[in-house]
Amino acid sequence: MIRSRQKVLSLVTWTLKRSIVVNAVSASSVDPSFSTMANTTNVAANTNLNKTTTEPGNIRNAPQLSILQTLENAEFIALGTPPTLLTVHSPPSVPLFVRRGALTSIYGLKSTSNTTPTYGSSSSSSSSSSSSSSTATSFTSSLTSSTQPLIRNTLEFPLWWDRFRFNGGHILSYQKLISTVPFSTLISSSSSSLSSSSKYGDVKSFANLILDGSSDWAILNKTAIQAYTGNSLSISMHKLPKYISKSLAKFLNISRIETGLWSFWNSGYTLLSGRGHVGVVGSGGVYQLQLAEDEEILIRKSAILGVTVNGPFDLENCIIKNDVTTTLYLPQEGEQNHKVKVKLNVEERPQGKQVLVQPSAWDQIVLGSKLALNWTRLVWHYQKVFFNRISIILSRFLLGNAEFVKVVGPRNILIQASPHLKQTQKDTRRSFGGSNSEEITQLNEKLVFIEPQINPESGSKSKSNDYLSYVEIDPKKGAVFQNTPNFRDSI
């Protein structure tokens, strides 16, 4: 009985399994997408469980960064308002120089599942050959193998000796990025290096310069260059001209005055020439101004970020010093030179012996009064010069009227909106060494000119009024009386 029951149960189970298979086959024959739908449902369920992205429309007020896999020329795109970020699309085998501490991100790299980035120090011959001018550290990653480099990063100090000489010991360091495939970077306008000026609290913004070889750029701000690239781009340092050129002085019908650019702490500028892309930063907003031919503009020296030039010697043909505050406090003409003229009555020289001429009491009173008047004028003049200097310093400190320069067109000028005043305050005391200060402070030698009054009388006998005498006023000794047969040797 038990065996018969087991056979019956097994028969029923086999019958049920067969009916299920037959129904599935019949369903698939009626609707072929039945099995596909089941598989798709399983895959979708697994995808929803492992999904790590969202739709781009779900992210608002954030521009999407583009990724370029094929690129021939570099592209610089400023982001934000004001543009505080710069995205750079760099082609392969073209080095990209980024200010140390400004690199924010590297993206757009094609990766494979069998590769792992490796980090280490560079031991190539190129870095060892440039070890005298820069120190280099690098990291490399590979696409197909650990020996094929993808991106090489090297820390370099370009033009370090010229920057040390012309920028008062201020040296900039840059990261050199070069890749075998196109890549993109995100660069910040501020730098975390020790030489950055973030301590002033100002916001920096980007401006992109595209050099096509038709004109050059003179960058006057020593910390303005944030990133640059281009195999044909040439960057060099030159000395700032102290005086304007002879041709400009002749054109303006003036003497060779100062340009107002040179200073002890900043005596050089950076010249950009050739072909390439340069990203410069300025405090606040950066604006461009185009001057037509024979057009002039007065602009604050510290607000100038860059000027278009034609070669390294063209900067002296377009910028002239124009110190507004110094011009306002110039003394009037006739107040600089003070000469005291003393007239003495000429006495006759007796023959045969020397006679010491003693001036009368009235002559001594007149001479003493004129000497006192001369010293009073000198003291008053020095006092006016001193207070003029104090007023200039106070006006620059309180009103902010720093050094102004005149730019003559045709030029393109980059202007930064809110330059800090640290460098201008350093140049304040040196601003009195120009041509205007020489006109204020020059004093003539303290000599006394004698206009003798000779009253000869007719007759053969020599009288006392023929004897000539003069007096010289020395600030240390006072009045010194001397005799002379004529005034040719003494005056």
UniProtKB/Swiss-Prot annotation:
Q: What is this protein called?
A: Altered inheritance of mitochondria protein 24, mitochondrial
- A Pfam cross-reference name: AIM24
Annotated region (Disordered), positions in chain: 114-133
| Protein family | Belongs to the AIM24 family.
Which cell locations does it reside in?
A: Mitochondrion
One record GO biological process: inner mitochondrial membrane organization
Keywords (alphabetical) are:
Mitochondrion, Transit peptide
**What coarse category fits the chief subcellular location reported for this protein?**
mitochondrion
**Transit peptide residues?**
1-61
| A Gene Ontology term for the protein's cellular component | mitochondrial inner membrane
Q: Does the keyword Transit peptide apply?
A: yes
